[in-house]
Every structure is written in C-alpha cells, then in structure tokens.
C-alpha cells in the first residue's frame, strides 16, 4: 500500500488531486508500504514534475510530427557498395533546435509512450530510406533503434510489414536494434 498527501492547501481541487497523485507515484517508486508528503521543493517532486513535462512534450511531438531522424553513416573498413546509416532520433523544439533522446526518452518509457514513439521512428526512417535510395541510386540500409517495450506489442510486426509495403522498402535493407 502507498499513500500520497499534498501538504499545501492553495490551488483548485484538481491541483490538489494532481499533487496527491504525484506523491502517490513517488511513494510507489520508493517501494512497498511507503508514504510521501508532497512538497514543491522536494527533489523527488521536482524530478517527477520534470518527467511529466517531458511526457507531455513527447505527446505533443507525436501529435504534431515534431520528431526528426539524423542519419549517422556507418562505413565498413573494407568499403563496399551502398550506404548504411544508423537513424538517430531527435525532438524538434519550437525554435528549431534539436533535443537529444536522453532528455525525453526516460519520460516516454515511464509513461508508456515508447510504442508510439517507435512507430513514429519507423515511419520516419522508412520515408527517409526511400528518399536516400532515390537520391543516391545506390543500395541503402538503415539501422533503426526500437525500445524493448515495443517487443510486447503484438501488432508491431504487422505495423512494420504494412509500413515496408507502404513506403516500398525491401525488408532486407532495414536492421532493427533493440535498446535496453
């Protein structure tokens, strides 16, 4: 059992419920049979608020196509035909700056957003594959990072198969890498 209690009486009933909810999550993270009092200056509260803010930003980025992939070229020592890229995820800020994944992926993991993020990455990568293929007229292979949480999604394989067909990308040109 866990118990979270806001200690400040200002704000609306919804504000108090959000504070109690935050305190409950912190108590739950601390282990069994814990209580936690909500204080605005509490480091755990500040960290939780930060994660919740990032989760909201990830949801906004998903809804508004505000993710971007950067291709990091991988060159084999012996050379060879074609191009091979690892696709690296970034979130685009309103000012155009790019946010590295370590800033927002922990919150996306905690709040169950990774399957949606992974699907967005797959779509972006396959679209990019087609554009690279047309621009280079060479074989193009891409490495796409997926979260471990997406493996439990029973519809992921069908989604990938449909996306490969939709973007006209041969399956052998895509390598999925699982992050820990």
Regions found by a protein language model. Give the residues of each.
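GGDEF/GGEEF active-site signature
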Residues: 1-7, 162
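Catalytic core regions of nucleotide second-messenger enzymes
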Residues: 8-11, 28, 97, 133-140, ...
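Residue-level signal for short segments within beta-strands and strand-turn junctions
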Residues: 2-4, 39, 75-76, 91
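C-di-GMP signaling machinery
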Residues: 6-7, 12-14, 19-22, 26-68, ...
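Active-site core of bacterial EAL-family cyclic-dinucleotide phosphodiesterase domains
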Residues: 49-107, 145, 177
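Catalytic core of bacterial c-di-GMP phosphodiesterases, primarily the EAL and HD-GYP domains
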Residues: 35, 76, 81-86, 113-180
């Amino acid at each position: 059992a866990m118990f979270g209690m806001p200690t400040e009486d200002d704000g609306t009933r919804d504000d108090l419920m959000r504070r109690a909810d935050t305190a409950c999550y912190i108590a739950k993270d601390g282990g069994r049979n814990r209580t936690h009092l909500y204080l605005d200056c509490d480091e755990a509260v500040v960290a939780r608020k930060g994660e919740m803010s990032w989760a909201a930003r990830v949801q906004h980025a998903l809804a508004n196509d505000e993710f971007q992939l950067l291709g990091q070229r991988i060159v084999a020592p012996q050379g060879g035909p074609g191009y091979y890229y690892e696709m690296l995820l970034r979130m685009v800020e309103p000012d155009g700056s790019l946010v590295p994944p370590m800033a927002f992926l922990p919150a996306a993991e905690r709040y169950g957003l990774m399957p949606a993020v992974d699907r967005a990455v797959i779509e972006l990568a396959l679209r990019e594959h087609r554009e690279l293929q047309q621009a280079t007229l060479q074989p193009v292979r891409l490495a796409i990072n997926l979260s471990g949480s997406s493996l439990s999604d029973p519809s992921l394989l069908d989604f990938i198969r449909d996306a490969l067909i939709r973007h006209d990308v041969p399956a052998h040109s895509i390598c999925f890498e699982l992050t820990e």
